[in-house]
Amino acid sequence: CGQLVECGWVQEKYPEKKLSLQHSVYTFNRETRQLYQDCFAPDSYTAPLELNREGAGSASPQNQEMVVYGRVPMMVSAGCVKRSLGACQIPHTQKQLSQGIPAAAFSCWLKDRYNVEFPVWVNCRHCTNTIYNSVPLSLHQYLAEQKRRGIRAIRLDFTDETAEKNAEVLEFFSEGKGTAPAQYTTGHYKKGVQ
C-alpha cells in the first residue's frame, strides 16, 4: 500500500491478503510503525527513503524491506506539465482508458539551471506529475551491512530503464557481476534528514 486509504481498502476487500507498506507511507519512527501494526497488521513495510543508516539500524529488520536501487520521487505535482506546455492529451487519454491502455508514462523531462534533466511521470488520468531524481539511488555499497542486519528483502524500483539496463542492474545486485551504475546517489542514507 502506498497510502493509508489503500491499506483500509485492501483490508476491507481482501482481508486474507497480507499488506506491505510502501516507502510513501510514513513509518519513520517506532510509534507510527506500531500504530500501523495495530490498525492494519502489515506483513512488511518499506523503510522510508529519508532514513539514514542509523535510523535503518534502529528498526526491526525482520519485516523491513529497503529500496536499494531506483529513481527517487522528488515531487508530486498537480500542475500538469503537459497542460502547461499546451500539449494536454485528456481527449486521447479518455480513449486510451476506454480501451484499457495505461494512461501514465514517462513522457518528458524537466531541465534545471545546471542543465540536469529530471524525468517526469505524467499521469493523465489524474492530471498529476511525479518528478524523479536525475540519477538513481544505489545503495550497493551497503548491501552487506543490510544483510548482516537481517533485513527481510531489498527492492529494486525500476522506472525509465530499458530492458537491457534492467537486466544489468538485476545481475549486478543479485550476482555481483558487472559494474555499479555510472552515476548514482546514496540519498539520505549517509547523512539523514536535517
Give, region by region, the residue ranges found by the protein language model.
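Active-site pocket-lining/capping segments in soluble small-molecule metabolic enzymes
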Residues: 1-194
